[in-house]
């Protein structure tokens, strides 16, 4: 599996509509998704799944001829977790992987009950691209729960992959074997936790990611009274005393979380329509806001912006980590309120011929 920083053919996205995730008919969410899709399309192709009944709304907000609308039914818009994960062989052949999706926990603690259409996304995108795919089911794995360096190292969290709602019949060793088998990784590094109060059970893509092989960014706070502090400290200590698949020690860049916790307001709770059994938030609930949830498209970085003073700090740090990429801050509050962020709504489709990081 190539690193996200390697060249892409394009990016998979899904047009938002779910009334329990996106309020007031997803109007604000669609504006944010359109801004992100257009920004990515300046650098690579965008393959956007959209329900037939919502196609007109997408056409109204999108203009780039690099954005390809693909009619398909979906339950929600989290392309990172429902889309195919792609691998490349030494001859430049590309295949998707059809992993099992159970809405982040199935009957144990899943966020919604019906996800039949979400399960079809991997096969549909592979068919559209003309790629074959491996069927890895019933192994449950979301794209947001892993990060790879393209050289044999994988990052994940115990909090997520060992959650009872994922693969309760598999041991840790058996999960590692599945990851090695399908992603061709050699070393799996298990951080204990993800970001505090992450409803996905601590996805790695909110907590830690690769800048390049041997170099990572880690969500951080210096406030020892913040519940995130112990989580970040545990990850830092582990990363400081381990090596990657090639025997390299890690260079660790601390990327601060927002200085002020971002919480759900009473106003945020208006305009939703929930189905039976769907997860609902409460006013005052802290959201899992993290600048780590940026997305690396070709030649650019799409960085979530929260209206916090650390927005500028995060942009400066990423500018130093990715000097050859344009840093594009995007107002991401509406996506955060929906349950994720920029990385969660995008899934890279690697170029068939692997190359150096961009």
Show where each model-derived region lies.
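Histidine/cysteine-enriched polar flanking segments
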Residues: 1-358
